[in-house]
Amino acid sequence: MSRYRGPRVKIIRRLGALPGLTNKTLKSKPGYINQSTSNKKVSQYRIRLEEKQKLRFHYGLTERQLLKYVRIARKAKGSTGQVLLQLLEMRLDNIIFRLGMAPTIPGARQLVNHRHILINNSTVDIPSYNCKPKDVITIKDRPKSQSIITKNLNSFQKQKIPNHLTFDLMQVKGLVNQIIDREWIFLKINELLVVEYYSRQV
């Protein structure tokens, strides 16, 4: 299954706020009822499916990519769900987003694909690059790159930078301090349901 490129409002209307996908929010009218879920008993499968979809759309992954991360998480030590979230949070495109250098994860992915981003002074154009503690993220020293990032930093409302990252606004430089803690993952998600959804596929 390919990466979703359709209307983003349609997705957040169904799944709720997904800040990585879009910074738009829905304002329901007073007394609004979601007709797709009202007066219906929601199955456990659907609940798990929707949690999985939240994760996939928020981080902008294909089905195959998400399944790959689940398999890696299952082989690692610790809680599979927590490891899964940490793997996704440490992707370069997500780190760029969390630093406030792009308004969304798709926007961050575009910056990486267009070779605007440096890791430890080397160009990295792979959005899925796994960032590690002590990695330094900077912008390529060319007018176009600097202009795009400066515009993003000045134009979009900033989320609080999580404790595993540091950002120097004057130098436009980010630093990965550590692997992210679960409490700093601000997506409203039950990762255990995602693991359960994939339990027969891994």
Swiss-Prot record:
Keyword Ribosomal protein: yes
Pfam families per record: Ribosomal_S4, S4
Domain of life according to the entry: Eukaryota
GO molecular function annotation: rRNA binding; structural constituent of ribosome
Compartment list: Plastid, Chloroplast
Keywords associated with the record: Chloroplast, Plastid, Ribonucleoprotein, Ribosomal protein, RNA-binding, rRNA-binding
CDD domains listed in its UniProt record: S4
PROSITE patterns cross-referenced by the UniProt entry: RIBOSOMAL_S4, S4
Transmembrane segments: none
GO biological process terms held by the UniProt record: ribosomal small subunit biogenesis; translation
Entry GO terms, CC: chloroplast; small ribosomal subunit
Domain S4 RNA-binding span(s) in chain numbering: 90-154
Family: Belongs to the universal ribosomal protein uS4 family.
Protein purpose: One of the primary rRNA binding proteins, it binds directly to 16S rRNA where it nucleates assembly of the body of the 30S subunit.
Assembly information from the UniProt record: Part of the 30S ribosomal subunit. Contacts protein S5. The interaction surface between S4 and S5 is involved in control of translational fidelity.
Name of the protein in its database record: Small ribosomal subunit protein uS4c
The organism of origin for this protein: Ricciocarpos natans
